[in-house]
Amino acid sequence: MHEYSIVTALLELCENHAKSNKAKKVTKVVVALGERSGVEPQLLESAFEVFKLDSVCAESELVIETKPMKFRCRSCGAEFLPKGIDFGSCEVCKAPNPELVGGKEMHLQSLEMEAEDEG
């Protein structure tokens, strides 16, 4: 399951951001996840719940924002979101084989952190 390695990298990113912002903990982690990213949201959530326990994210909530597929026509350049399961042609000019330009991504969208107490 590659979700484990993804969560490990995600937690490392969170640790780095918390350290550079002098935060004592991360309370919310928001991830953008394309519907064609190849990552299972439920497995990602499960792995996060287990791996976060020994990190700055121990008490954090994981929010996954699903990003839809987006296509660009190779002929007319139109960008569109597919309607239904037939996305083999441009919805504007009907040319075949549009390019998938969105929905494959996965990235850290935002973090909510709690600052260290100043003393």
UniProtKB/Swiss-Prot annotation:
Keywords, ordered alphabetically: Metal-binding, Nickel, Zinc
Residues given in the record as Ni(2+) binding sites: 2
Metal-binding keyword on record: yes
GO biological process: protein maturation; protein modification process
InterPro entries: HypA/HybF
MF annotations from Gene Ontology: nickel cation binding; zinc ion binding
Binding, Zn(2+): 73, 76, 90, 93
PANTHER family found in the cross-reference section: HYDROGENASE MATURATION FACTOR HYPA
Function: Involved in the maturation of [NiFe] hydrogenases. Required for nickel insertion into the metal center of the hydrogenase.
Family (UniProt): Belongs to the HypA/HybF family.
Protein name, entry field: Hydrogenase maturation factor HypA
Gene source species: Wolinella succinogenes (strain ATCC 29543 / DSM 1740 / CCUG 13145 / JCM 31913 / LMG 7466 / NCTC 11488 / FDC 602W) (Vibrio succinogenes)
